[in-house]
UniProtKB/Swiss-Prot annotation:
It is found in: Cytoplasm. The lineage of its organism: Bacteria, Pseudomonadati, Pseudomonadota, Gammaproteobacteria, Alteromonadales. The active site is at 14 (proton acceptor), 42 (proton donor). This is Adenylosuccinate synthetase. Binds 1 Mg(2+) ion per subunit.
Amino acid sequence: MGKNVVVLGTQWGDEGKGKIVDLLTEQAKYVVRYQGGHNAGHTLVIDGDKTVLHLIPSGILRDNVKCIIGNGVVLAPDALMKEINMLKERGVPVEERLLISEACPLILPFHCALDIAREKARGNKAIGTTGRGIGPAYEDKISRRGLRVGDLFNAELFAEKLKEVMAYHNFMLTEYYGCEAVDYETTLKDALAIADYLKSMCTDVTELLDQARKNGDNILFEGAQGTLLDIDHGTYPFVTSSNTTAGGVATGSGFGPRHLDYVCGIIKAYTTRVGAGPFPTELRDEIGDHLGTKGQEFGATTGRKRRPGWLDIVAMKRAVQINSISGFCLTKLDVLDGLKEVKLCVGYQYPDGSISTVTPLAAEGYEQVTPVLETMPGWSESTFGATSIDQLPQAALDYIKRIEELLETPVDIISTGPDRNETMILVNPFS
């Protein structure tokens, strides 16, 4: 009997999901992306060779794995083509192993233009989007005016729908934001040029996954971004435009939620955030510099410097609740090597002196709190590349144990370096 496993981020993204997905896909027949778009950046290092994927599931580097892009993903045809060509140049076969839902909303040039125009108009109140059109594409979906992959297969109807939606968005671009309009004819021509190619990879994803389940195949669902960026449960409005939590699997792929067997929450040994938004445990000192430099904390998609801080247990409790996490994968433990002390945020203190162990429901609430920190001894020994729990110093083991105690959730996998081999699996999610 097969197992259906979800791998998702528990923080603000950049937790190391790509590596863990790649590692676990050795046991999977299907890997499914169910939300987000090419704003994701999943970095995989295999025998020292680095690959960064934004749209195609990380399982593509495993020869026997079928990769699926579900209906919850907003798909930019140009970004998809760029990624396919990059992989083919590296000798990775793609077309025969990539399957796409016809219900995926399309990201088109006017979405990117709107995204950039809006961020510019916000000035110092910018959210920090990637400028890749993700939000505007989801907005069109919710407004029921969006174009989907399947629309490309009827050229006449697509042209009609495109003209209508572009008239609306170009009016906003020119009259409200004072920007140039996006050319309709060019957009139409470029979109239709890829229609037949996309059609060759399209399938009924819901039916495919249900048959795979009945056949006893292992399925892995690959999340993008992180729990604290969820459109409903994150630090709103400093969030992404999709449901990054486990509930997004069902809506973004059509796979029944009762069939999920294990939810693996990727948790970095510290915390980072890229772009704007509240961050109670942020470190703007030499320790923050240490974490950022040693952890090579630069966004895989934008190249932006990430903001580092201590691990926030309060926020992680919310992530456990929302996702019903079965077990954690703790990543980048080695980045803490050499610190005399390590700290965990175990509460939020408000101006009146009260302490809460529950996260606020919006960004404004975070601005009032200061972190209540629990200090633990650090370790001088190197954990980099450790592949056995016996190789970890006692202080590191105590740190891991304390995380498990506070979150009432086991750490089942530990990552001690970027390569897929630099990992210890204590409990196999597929077992």
